[in-house]
């Protein structure tokens, strides 16, 4: 706890007043300088729209544009041109390759179609020749069979004729013998062989 004496109390306000008087101008000066700076900053135009900086702005614009133009002309544009040329060359090569492959495919298709047509023609020719050969062989076999049958029929007819002739001859002999036996039984005597044969022959003619 502090005790303030009357003498100290009188001196203290004077000292404080002197100190404040000495310090106030400094604070005022700082305040005044700060106020002036802040006022100027608040009242000044937007820097890009400040006419006093147009020259520097135009200069930097020209410099920036020139640098950008040089960059485009020397670096970016050549790279883009090289890329476009490379793409154009690649596309041209791809188109040429596609055309070559298409031509090869068309040639292969034509060759295949030609070979297929030749194979069909050959197959048709072989089939036709086989049919003609089979038809000729069948005709030849038919003629051979017909000739063989004709010969067999002729031989059979000759044989049948011989059998008929022999049978008729045997029938005549049997008839003559039978007639002679009948006459012998009827008249009690033998008839002449010539008469019996003549009678049998006459009977054959009448039959």
Swiss-Prot record:
Q: Which residues cross the membrane?
A: 53-72
Q: How does it sit in the membrane?
A: Single-pass membrane protein
> Keywords of this protein's UniProt record, alphabetized?
ATP synthesis, Cell inner membrane, Cell membrane, CF(0), Hydrogen ion transport, Ion transport, Membrane, Transmembrane, Transmembrane helix, Transport
Provide a Gene Ontology MF annotation, just one.
Answer: proton-transporting ATPase activity, rotational mechanism
Q: Which GO terms describe its cellular component?
A: plasma membrane; proton-transporting ATP synthase complex
Q: Where in the cell is it found?
A: Cell inner membrane
Predominant place of localization: membrane
Q: Name one Pfam family in it.
A: ATP-synt_B
Assembly and oligomerization: F-type ATPases have 2 components, F(1) - the catalytic core - and F(0) - the membrane proton channel. F(1) has five subunits: alpha(3), beta(3), gamma(1), delta(1), epsilon(1). F(0) has three main subunits: a(1), b(2) and c(10-14). The alpha and beta chains form an alternating ring which encloses part of the gamma chain. F(1) is attached to F(0) by a central stalk formed by the gamma and epsilon chains, while a peripheral stalk is formed by the delta and b chains.
- Role this protein plays: F(1)F(0) ATP synthase produces ATP from ADP in the presence of a proton or sodium gradient. F-type ATPases consist of two structural domains, F(1) containing the extramembraneous catalytic core and F(0) containing the membrane proton channel, linked together by a central stalk and a peripheral stalk. During catalysis, ATP synthesis in the catalytic domain of F(1) is coupled via a rotary mechanism of the central stalk subunits to proton translocation.
- What family is it from? Belongs to the ATPase B chain family.
Protein name per Swiss-Prot or TrEMBL = ATP synthase subunit b 2
Biological source species: Rhizobium etli (strain CIAT 652)
Q: What is the lineage of its organism?
A: Bacteria, Pseudomonadati, Pseudomonadota, Alphaproteobacteria, Hyphomicrobiales
Q: Which gene encodes it?
A: atpF2
């Amino acid at each position: 706890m502090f005790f303030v004496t009357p003498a100290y109390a009188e001196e203290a306000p004077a000292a404080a007043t002197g100190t404040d008087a000495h310090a106030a101008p400094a604070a005022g000066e700082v305040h005044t300088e700060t106020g002036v700076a802040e006022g100027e900053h608040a009242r000044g135009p937007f820097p890009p729209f400040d006419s006093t900086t147009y020259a520097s702005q135009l200069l930097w614009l020209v410099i920036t544009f020139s640098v950008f133009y040089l960059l485009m002309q020397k670096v970016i544009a050549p790279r883009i041109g090289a890329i476009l040329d490379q793409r154009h060359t690649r596309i041209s090569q791809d188109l040429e390759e596609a055309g070559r492959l298409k031509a090869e495919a068309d040639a292969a298709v034509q060759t295949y179609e030609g070979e297929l047509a030749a194979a069909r023609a050959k197959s048709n020719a072989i089939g036709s020749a086989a049919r003609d050969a089979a038809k000729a062989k069948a005709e030849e076999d038919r003629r051979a069979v017909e000739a063989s049958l004709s010969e067999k029929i002729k031989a059979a007819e000759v044989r049948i004729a011989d059998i008929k002739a022999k049978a008729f001859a045997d029938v005549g002999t049997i008839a003559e013998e039978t007639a002679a036996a009948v006459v012998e039984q009827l008249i009690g005597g033998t008839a002449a062989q010539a008469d019996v044969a003549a009678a049998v022959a006459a009977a054959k003619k009448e039959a």
